[in-house]
A protein has these predicted regions:
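Non-Sec secretion/translocation targeting segments of pathogen effectors
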Residues: 1-13, 188
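Active-site-flanking segments in enzyme catalytic domains
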Residues: 16-215
């Protein structure tokens, strides 16, 4: 799977036009984004029922903790990316997961994800590797620094402050390098850790911000 550790923060660049940003923070070209849409299918079309069940549990868990519902979650040909989120300045325009990856068995998906993301220290540690990508993308759908709604902008002030405090903390544990890329990846990873990993003062604060502003 593709991997990046920083550079341009494409989540901060959404405007009126919809853009597609991958789970590693890369902005897709218009042609690539169109291919994702054109090849999309229902999650229910996946081969293995246990994988479908795990993804649906991930969505349900997110909705329960964060109080946020995302209407469009599908699988598609997303190249070498685990997932893609379509956004504009008004919010999420849909989440698409990698059809090839999630058409494997649960054990295959989890083993691969642990090896490429947890063992390398790239992503935050969680107890639900198969649900990590969908939760990460749901967090992006909930908030990015480019959203222009009043409550999203107000929440952003607190999220950015939390990010700065987190970045200065040399004693924090359970975090990967990806969250340090920018405030948007910090948000997605800290929320994911809070929902599926070991909670701490940063995960608790992030979730409380989402609830406070009803994101």
């Amino acid at each position: 799977m593709a991997k990046t550790s920083g550079g341009t923060n494409n989540y901060a660049k959404a405007g009126a036009r919809v853009i597609a940003v991958t789970s590693t923070g890369r902005k897709m070209t218009a042609k690539q984004a169109a291919k994702v849409k054109d090849t999309s299918e229902s999650i229910d079309s996946l081969k293995h029922r246990e994988v479908v069940k795990q993804l649906n549990r991930g969505v349900s868990r997110y909705e329960k903790v964060m109080g946020v519902r995302e209407r469009t979650i599908r699988i598609a040909n997303t190249g070498n990316e685990y997932g893609v989120t379509f956004i504009n300045e008004n919010g999420s325009q849909g989440i698409y997961l990698n059809k090839r990856v999630f058409n494997q068995t649960r054990n295959q998906i989890e083993a691969s994800y642990k090896k490429s993301n947890y063992e390398t220290g790239f992503k935050n540690l969680t107890n639900r590797p198969i649900q990590h990508t969908i939760t990460h993308e749901l967090a992006h759908a909930t908030w990015t620094s480019s959203y222009t709604g009043a409550k999203q902008k107000a929440a952003g002030v607190e999220i950015k402050s939390l990010y700065r405090s987190w970045a200065r903390d040399r004693k924090k544990t359970g975090y990967g390098t990806y969250g340090a890329s920018n405030v948007d990846e910090f948000w997605a990873e800290v929320v994911t850790k809070g929902i599926h990993g070991k909670a701490d003062k940063y995960t608790k604060k992030a979730i409380s911000i989402a609830r406070k502003y009803k994101l």
